């Protein structure tokens, strides 16, 4: 098979079942090889192994479209899937970017019109009661940028864990406290005036997606994104159902995916949403989502973490952005370096990821 350099033409990896990523061949891909200090890169991975090989994890490094390095700890394989926790939020953001584009194109069911300034609660049926009058001012943009005023981590509201006799979406909508006694019925501020990392706010986006698109978000993403870029083995949790609201796609956590397949998403974003001849995700949405979405926390775009002002990762490129989840599940994208770095795992909660990326960049010019 003829090897294709992504620097000279548009290269996109086939699905894993059909060969997957092209590995860097030191004898053939001399142009790319000349840019990489393999001795230093190997040292970076060895140091990582020394500290973190006691937990299940995987690392994939893609440069110029080639898989230049990967590492898996004990009992972990290239196909091993991990719950990437809040990286899921960025997938929700991608889904909403597609929904907004469909609105622009007039292809939503019943030609519904939606934009970032649309009031979220205007799409809920009357049966969804509003627990705080101020919620009528919450926009789609507020939900995607964590500025809705719906209680989140600042108020010790983590996830959407329900009581035994209520569902998770009942808690997210403010109808019932969670199993730890925390409530979301009242906003902590007027929408757009405070930044708070809120899982209940993200849960709103799942219900709204179904109401507007008439499809569950995970089903839509499978067709519109996953199938097109060769993601074959990812799965997405759903919440609720039975006598409770739902079941609906989990918007804040619950995507299970391998390091290699998560790297496909990073590569898609690095290519401004293009995959081969198909614009899978609108480039205009990627541009908007990977820049600060508001001034309250300029390190947060629309569901992506960003470095536009050089404050999130000082000393690293300002075009760098990431998908981030608990247990340091990460997908870093640096378009100016044509670099994607993925780390998936079951821990630790924190590590010096900034130093790790700096050392990877030192090895890859």
Identify the function of each model-found stretch.
Residues 1-77, 101-113, 215, 361-365:
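N-terminal leader/targeting segments and the immediately adjacent pre-domain N-terminus
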Residues 201-208, 253-275, 329-345:
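Active-site-proximal alpha-helical segments within enzyme catalytic domains
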Residues 83, 102-151, 211-252:
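Active-site helix/loop module of the DD-peptidase/beta-lactamase fold
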């Amino acid at each position: 098979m003829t090897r294709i350099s992504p620097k000279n033409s548009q290269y996109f990896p086939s699905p894993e079942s059909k060969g997957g990523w092209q590995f860097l061949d030191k004898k053939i891909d001399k142009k790319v090889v000349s840019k990489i200090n393999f001795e230093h890169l190997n040292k970076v991975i060895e140091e990582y192994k020394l500290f973190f090989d006691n937990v299940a994890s995987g690392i994939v490094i893609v440069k110029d479209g080639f898989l230049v390095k990967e590492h898996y700890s004990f009992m972990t394989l290239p196909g091993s899937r991990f719950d990437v926790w809040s990286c899921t939020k960025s997938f929700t953001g991608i889904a909403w970017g597609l929904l907004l584009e469909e609105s622009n194109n007039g292809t939503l069911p019943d030609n519904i019109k939606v934009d970032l300034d649309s009031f979220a609660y205007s799409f809920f049926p009357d049966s969804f009661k509003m627990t705080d009058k101020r919620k009528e001012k919450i926009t789609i943009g507020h939900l995607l940028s964590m500025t809705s005023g719906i209680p989140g981590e600042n108020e010790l509201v983590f996830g959407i864990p329900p009581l035994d006799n209520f569902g998770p979406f009942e808690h997210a909508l403010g109808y019932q406290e969670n199993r730890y006694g925390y409530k979301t019925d009242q906003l902590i501020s007027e929408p757009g005036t405070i930044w708070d990392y809120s899982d209940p706010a993200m849960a709103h986006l799942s219900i709204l997606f179904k109401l507007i698109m008439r499809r569950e978000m995970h089903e839509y993403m499978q067709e519109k994104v996953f199938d097109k870029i060769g993601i074959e083995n990812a799965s997405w949790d759903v919440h609720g159902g039975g006598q409770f609201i739902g079941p609906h796609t989990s918007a804040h956590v619950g995507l299970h995916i391998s390091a290699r397949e998560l790297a496909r998403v990073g590569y898609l974003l690095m290519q401004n949403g293009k995959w081969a001849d198909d614009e899978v995700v609108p480039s205009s949405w990627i541009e908007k989502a990977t820049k600060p979405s508001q001034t309250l926390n300029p390190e947060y775009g629309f569901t992506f973490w960003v470095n536009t002002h050089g404050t999130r990762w000082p000393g690293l490129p300002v075009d760098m952005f990431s998908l981030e989840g608990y247990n340091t599940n990460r997908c870093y994208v640096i378009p100016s370096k044509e670099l994607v770095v993925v780390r998936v795992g079951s821990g630790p909660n924190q590590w010096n990821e900034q130093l790790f990326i700096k050392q990877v960049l030192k090895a890859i010019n």
